[in-house]
Amino acid sequence: MGDYDSDDEKSQVEKLRHAKVPRGMFVSGWDDDADELIEEDKNPQSSIERMILWAVNENRISEVREILKLDADTVNAKDNDGYTPLHRAAYNNFVDMAKLLLQYHANPNARTELGWTPLHSACKWNNADCAHLLLQFGADVNAESDGKQTPLHITATVSNCRNTATVLLLDRYIQPRKENNSEELASVIARRTGMSFPIFESGEEAYDCETGLID
């Protein structure tokens, strides 16, 4: 990790430790059907792991960088629901933050208690730029949550998901015909929830041609 224990770095983290935390809510703990807001962390300064989770959520990139220099292992810290700093950067579409975390070897396939990866989180909020970045760093485009929801299934629940759907469907490893626990394809969900379903159906057709499922 190197010797990063300079006075300036310690000072930055100490400022963060005593920072006034806004009384907001952190988005976390989603199940496969709906978003949930979990109770805010009322004391993020109590540990360096909680500090980095809070700082990422507030997009305080300089403070996050200093925390990582002091303790690089915090890059994969988890909250009570299993969300990592990278999950939080992904669902907020903090692309520069996500890039910093990935450069410090954040796990792009880390899973929450419900089996969500950072890519699921990016797709839930139609954050195409973060989704693209995660795929570049080895995120599993077909990762299944506990409900067998892939990132493509999650994308399909968003009415205006054209950009993110395109990013996923252009990935060479995408399997658009995977079914979730309800035995639904992503295209079926997309047809029910929004105007982007032609993209999903075109993706399935291209996949079928590529894999020889149709003549």
Swiss-Prot record:
Superkingdom, according to UniProt?
Eukaryota
Q: What happens when the gene is disrupted?
A: Lethal. RNAi-mediated knockdown in the wing disrupts cell polarity and decreases levels of dsh phosphorylation.
Q: Where are the transmembrane segments?
A: none
What ranges cover the ANK repeats?
Answer: 81-110, 114-143
Q: Which Pfam families match?
A: Ank_2, Ank_4
Where in the cell does this protein reside?
Answer: Cytoplasm, Cytosol; Cell membrane
Which GO BP terms sit in this record?
regulation of establishment of planar polarity
Function summary = Required for regulating the establishment of planar cell polarity in the wing. Forms a complex with Bdbt which likely functions in the regulation of planar polarity by promoting the activity of Dco during planar polarity establishment. Within the complex, probably functions to stabilize Bdbt, while Bdbt directly promotes Dco activity in regulating phosphorylation of core proteins such as dsh, and asymmetric localization.
Q: Which PANTHER family match?
A: ANKYRIN REPEAT AND PROTEIN KINASE DOMAIN-CONTAINING PROTEIN, ANKYRIN REPEAT-CONTAINING PROTEIN-RELATED
What is the protein name given in its UniProt record?
Ankyrin repeat domain-containing protein 49
